């Protein structure tokens, strides 16, 4: 009788469902996974070491390039760590702007996660719908920072600038008629806040479309229900956080449990799953988008009636405005020193953590009193989740591994750092 042996299959790193440069070595018994061994490091760029060679301001843009789907959330943790070491108080308006854009970023991340996860399982429509909404959200990024992805909008002490009073408008061209341009511009007549407010009113309808396409879809449920189950106790032991932990039934959210910025002033709920499978994690992310929309609406309403500064007035930390710099020698010196030498941070250490769209994202910073970090350690949530892939995939089919990877929501910029 022939000896039966398992065989090994390389999944990725060029596989479209690998969500980046994941190389997964699968040991298969027929089509059933016996062992899954993730090989990482293919996108390693030494971000932590690079930060040690840059001033605190110069190191900030590297944060955007970690999880490049949740750009401003990465910046948020970095700025909180620097501010904690400086003992710096941020203006209240800047805090509201930060929270509003952190939740816009959460929408960007979850839309891509749900859309890409559905696409991996064969549902293409949701991905196309999600990119329709992401276009408006990226326009909000562009309005405040000039960039659609790597914004570098958050700064130690506040944000780069206040919200603009106008929105950029589409122009007719060879491939876009005047009629279609008018349709695209119909919600761009007012300020950025008007544009965001209009989006928050439309977004629940879009969420309803996703629910119609997926939530009760028989094929979607067959692909996700009972797949990649992680119990609440096991999720805690594995170090899960974010939607991965809440999907397993643990109501842990840093915005509620350890409030930062102004989350303690806002009204929102924390969705929690029951069984800890791919379907529960999908539902948690869908409900989180609804709650993020609520938070954005509350921030818009507050920002409309509360003008004020958006960055600290300490010019040793934040640059003076352009007008005063051009008319005042002291301000010019501040500007020159800030961008040539940076600012020095008192000797000490700080750990700042936020509720990132993927989980608990933390920055541990050590300062020796110089103008550059002595050591910066990044705690990425997806790195922890990816480590559990072997356990979650055992006993499932190859096709189920794709669904599990989609529900993990991994981005290799932050996994490999």
Curated annotation (Swiss-Prot):
UniProt KW keywords: Cell inner membrane, Cell membrane, Membrane, NAD, Quinone, Translocase, Transport, Ubiquinone
Lineage: superkingdom: Bacteria
One GO MF term attached to the UniProt entry: quinone binding
Catalytic activity: a quinone + NADH + 5 H(+)(in) = a quinol + NAD(+) + 4 H(+)(out)
Function as written in the Swiss-Prot or TrEMBL entry: NDH-1 shuttles electrons from NADH, via FMN and iron-sulfur (Fe-S) centers, to quinones in the respiratory chain. The immediate electron acceptor for the enzyme in this species is believed to be ubiquinone. Couples the redox reaction to proton translocation (for every two electrons transferred, four hydrogen ions are translocated across the cytoplasmic membrane), and thus conserves the redox energy in a proton gradient.
PANTHER family xref list: NADH DEHYDROGENASE [UBIQUINONE] IRON-SULFUR PROTEIN 2, MITOCHONDRIAL (PTHR11993:SF10), NADH-UBIQUINONE OXIDOREDUCTASE 49 KDA SUBUNIT (PTHR11993)
HAMAP family cross-referenced by the UniProt entry: NDH1_NuoD
Protein name in the entry: NADH-quinone oxidoreductase subunit D
Species of origin: Albidiferax ferrireducens (strain ATCC BAA-621 / DSM 15236 / T118) (Rhodoferax ferrireducens)
């Amino acid at each position: 009788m022939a000896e039966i042996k398992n065989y090994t299959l390389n999944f990725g790193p060029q596989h479209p469902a690998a969500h980046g440069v994941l190389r997964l070595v699968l040991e298969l018994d027929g089509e059933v996974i016996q062992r899954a061994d993730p090989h990482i490091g293919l996108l390693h760029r030494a971000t932590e070491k690079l930060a040690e060679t840059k001033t605190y301001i110069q190191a900030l843009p590297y944060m955007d390039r970690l999880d490049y789907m949740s750009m401003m959330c990465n910046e948020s943790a970095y700025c909180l760590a620097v501010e904690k070491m400086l003992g710096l108080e941020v203006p209240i308006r800047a805090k509201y702007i930060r929270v509003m854009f952190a939740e816009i970023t959460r929408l960007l991340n979850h839309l891509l996660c749900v859309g890409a996860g559905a696409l991996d399982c064969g549902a293409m429509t949701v991905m196309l719908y999600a990119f329709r909404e992401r276009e408006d959200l990226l326009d909000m990024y562009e309005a405040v920072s000039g960039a659609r992805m790597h914004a570098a909008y958050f700064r130690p002490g506040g944000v780069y600038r206040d919200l603009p009073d106008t929105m950029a408008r589409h122009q007719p061209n060879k491939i876009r008629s005047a009629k279609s341009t008018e349709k695209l511009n119909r919600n761009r007549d007012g300020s950025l806040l008007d544009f965001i407010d209009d989006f928050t009113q439309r977004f629940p309808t879009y969420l309803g479309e996703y629910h119609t396409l997926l939530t009760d879809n028989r094929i979607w449920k067959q692909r996700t229900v009972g797949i990649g189950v992680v119990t609440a106790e096991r999720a805690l032991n594995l170090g899960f956080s974010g939607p991965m932990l809440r999907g397993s039934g643990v109501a842990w959210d840093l915005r509620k449990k350890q409030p930062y910025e102004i989350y303690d002033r806002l009204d929102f709920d924390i969705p929690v799953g029951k069984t800890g499978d791919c379907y529960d994690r999908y539902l948690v992310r869908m409900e989180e988008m609804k709650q993020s929309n609520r938070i954005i609406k509350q921030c818009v309403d507050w920002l409309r009636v509360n003008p004020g500064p958006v960055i600290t007035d300490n010019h040793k930390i934040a640059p003076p405005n352009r007008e005063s710099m051009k008319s005042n020698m002291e301000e010019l010196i501040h500007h020159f020193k800030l961008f040539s030498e940076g600012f020095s941070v008192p000797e000490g250490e700080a750990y700042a953590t936020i509720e990132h769209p993927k989980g608990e994202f933390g920055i541990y910073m050590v300062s020796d009193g110089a103008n550059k970090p002595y050591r910066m350690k990044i705690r990425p949530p997806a790195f922890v989740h990816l480590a559990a892939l072997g356990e979650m995939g055992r006993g499932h089919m190859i096709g189920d591994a794709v669904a599990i990877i989609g529900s993990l929501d991994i981005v290799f910029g932050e996994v490999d750092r």
